[in-house]
Amino acid sequence: MAMDSSLQARLFPGLAIKIQRSNGLIHSANVRTVNLEKSCVSVEWAEGGATKGKEIDFDDVAAINPELLQLLPLHPKDNLPLQENVTIQKQKRRSVNSKIPAPKESLRSRSTRMSTVSELRITAQENDMEVELPAAANSRKQFSVPPAPTRPSCPAVAEIPLRMVSEEMEEQVHSIRGSSSANPVNSVRRKSCLVKEVEKMKNKREEKKAQNSEMRMKRAQEYDSSFPNWEFARMIKEFRATLECHPLTMTDPIEEHRICVCVRKRPLNKQELAKKEIDVISIPSKCLLLVHEPKLKVDLTKYLENQAFCFDFAFDETASNEVVYRFTARPLVQTIFEGGKATCFAYGQTGSGKTHTMGGDLSGKAQNASKGIYAMASRDVFLLKNQPCYRKLGLEVYVTFFEIYNGKLFDLLNKKAKLRVLEDGKQQVQVVGLQEHLVNSADDVIKMIDMGSACRTSGQTFANSNSSRSHACFQIILRAKGRMHGKFSLVDLAGNERGADTSSADRQTRMEGAEINKSLLALKECIRALGQNKAHTPFRESKLTQVLRDSFIGENSRTCMIATISPGISSCEYTLNTLRYADRVKELSPHSGPSGEQLIQMETEEMEACSNGALIPGNLSKEEEELSSQMSSFNEAMTQIRELEEKAMEELKEIIQQGPDWLELSEMTEQPDYDLETFVNKAESALAQQAKHFSALRDVIKALRLAMQLEEQASRQISSKKRPQ
């Protein structure tokens, strides 16, 4: 502080001093202002035609401009040491012309020691350092003598300690000067206030980084970092800790709905556990489901997007088939005894548990049908049938079991015989050739289920090596004196994936996917029409809705949809598609109702998802318009293929039906006295008929070949457009 106060007296505006730039360059600058509070000066200089300036601490000024300190007077001492008195006397003697001889060597050494001590003080002030000189202090004690005149007769008494002090002081001065000259600025230079603030901020950032790193280390110890998504697992666990869970129980009341939409979550299977997948589905209450969708920000920061869905019932992974049946299909059994039509669907991704829910527990390819909704509904049907109020009706129980594959019907209880769907004059849909089997107990029903399930068509997809690629419909029909009293249709729908998700994307697979998605779209529209009491129900859009037409019309019709979902993180996209489909069927949402524009957008998204990726023309880009036109061509080709296939089958049947005529002609020739004229006439007539059918069959086959080529071309174009660049 003494140095600062002394230096302040030397600093004033306009003074030229030396400064050091941040790049190490030292040049001259003029003092502009002197700030006593901050102990700094503001300087300015001209550079490149412009005036620049900066602030410099007093210590930096002293370090770069030591000459300012050298000009300062020394502080007066009350008791001057011996060497200072000698120096003063020496100067006085030199100031007058005296004939006294020159001083001896002892006085010269004293003079040298005095200059050394003075330089040491100045150097210490220049460097703003406290220099401890224990040797000097001791030497002072050694040579402190009473102020008596020094006699030449005893020079050795003071000469020895003075020489020792002189040598020690010179060594300390040289060491201090050496260190100061080696690093004249950095050793004593203090930083400006701005630099100090920046360093404080930097230190805080480093401390925060260290704390975050320590927290990450602790979290990494709590979670197995070998998991590919352990960070998402931690975030999901922390989010679930904030939830209050009230799951569905068997004691909860059963609410009756005309359209009941439920969702069921299955547990992680062995394959998902082997891949160390995490569960991204939470069910905190009996009607609420949360999807923790993993996301990445632009800077690759991981976060969760929690999406909520509301349904009539939500079943977690601990719910058994009995619990699911109690709240879904069981209330519908009463409906068919009251003369109504009931339908229960299982909808979802391949491998999400549809067949397990409807058909029973699976062990490999073997299935325990007694644990499925099929068998449970059958048991309740026979229980109600034997009650006194319904026993007097004389009801009989029949069952049918068929599948819809690629738009064609096959009877699973009659060796997969092909069926035809026709509409009679009363606009009633009839399934020609479908056999109804009379059953007398639930055990008979289970046998029928086992027999039909063994014949069901399956295929391989990315999610399931034995995936059901057809819609299976098990119907329980009540008849009173041959007349239908009620019907309960239990449908296990095919997987809702697109054809591009299968292992082998050949034409057959594409046709499967297109037909499945088309029927699912038609089914959703029919259910929504039923819920909104619309006058028109679009049941003719697919074979599935045609067969179930009577379930969508009439006031005494009830429907239940069970949406099954997979909880793994790899199935998150398909799970969201399933939940959105089910949510739009019921039109239940935790948010406010959508506006008209949002409904149009929703319909457009549904058409895209359910038409094997078709795009609806509208506000689309050029590439999207091209893809939309190609998708439209693909759908037209698929529809044309199905129509031509039906025509080809009809022409072939007509040709086969002419077979007996040729056999009759052959038998005629076996007779010894057959009429040749009659033979020729019949042969010409048969040839004319056959030529007509063969010509028609040839035209149909040509058109079918062309349609297949168009479908192949459209499929390749769509694949090339969808392939990432």
Swiss-Prot record:
Record motif Nuclear localization signal, residues: 415-418
SMART domains: KISc (SM00129)
Tissue: Expressed at high levels in thymus and testis, at low levels in small intestine, the mucosal lining of colon, and placenta, and at very low levels in spleen and ovary; expression is not detected in prostate, peripheral blood Leukocytes, heart, brain, lung, liver, skeletal muscle, kidney or pancreas. Isoform 2 is testis-specific.
Gene Ontology CC annotations of this record: centrosome; chromosome, centromeric region; cytoplasm; cytosol; glutamatergic synapse; kinesin complex; kinetochore; membrane
PTM section of the record: Phosphorylation by AURKB, regulates association with centromeres and kinetochores and the microtubule depolymerization activity.
Subcellular localization(s) per the UniProt record: Cytoplasm, Cytoskeleton; Nucleus; Chromosome, Centromere; Chromosome, Centromere, Kinetochore
Annotated ranges, domain Kinesin motor: 258-588
Chain location of the short sequence motif Microtubule tip localization signal per the record: 98-101
The keyword Cytoplasm appears for this protein: yes
Positions with a binding annotation for ATP: R264, G348, Q349, T350, G351, S352, G353, K354, T355
Spans annotated as Disordered: 89-116
Effect listed in the UniProt record for changing S95E: Alters interaction with MAPRE1 and association with microtubule growing ends
Globular: region residues: 2-254
PROSITE patterns named in the record: KINESIN_MOTOR_1, KINESIN_MOTOR_2
InterPro entries: KIF2A-like_N, Kinesin-like_fam, Kinesin_motor_CS, Kinesin_motor_dom, Kinesin_motor_dom_sf, P-loop_NTPase
Modified residues (Phosphoserine): S6, S22, S95, S106, S109, S111, S115, S166, S175, S187, S192, S519, S621, S633
GO biological process, one term: microtubule-based movement
Keyword list, A-Z: Acetylation, ATP-binding, Cell cycle, Cell division, Centromere, Chromosome, Chromosome partition, Coiled coil, Cytoplasm, Cytoskeleton, Kinetochore, Microtubule, Mitosis, Nucleotide-binding, Nucleus, Phosphoprotein, Ubl conjugation
UniProt GO molecular function: ATP binding; ATP hydrolysis activity; centromeric DNA binding; microtubule binding; microtubule motor activity; microtubule plus-end binding
Entry function: In complex with KIF18B, constitutes the major microtubule plus-end depolymerizing activity in mitotic cells. Regulates the turnover of microtubules at the kinetochore and functions in chromosome segregation during mitosis. Plays a role in chromosome congression and is required for the lateral to end-on conversion of the chromosome-microtubule attachment.
Entry similarity comment: Belongs to the TRAFAC class myosin-kinesin ATPase superfamily. Kinesin family. MCAK/KIF2 subfamily.
Known partners and oligomeric status: Interacts with CENPH. Interacts with MTUS2/TIP150; the interaction is direct. Interacts with MAPRE1; the interaction is direct, regulated by phosphorylation and is probably required for targeting to growing microtubule plus ends. Interacts with KIF18B at microtubule tips; this interaction increases the affinity of both partners for microtubule plus ends and is required for robust microtubule depolymerization. Phosphorylation by AURKA or AURKB strongly reduces KIF18B-binding.
Domain notes: The microtubule tip localization signal (MtLS) motif; mediates interaction with MAPRE1 and targeting to the growing microtubule plus ends.
Protein name: Kinesin-like protein KIF2C
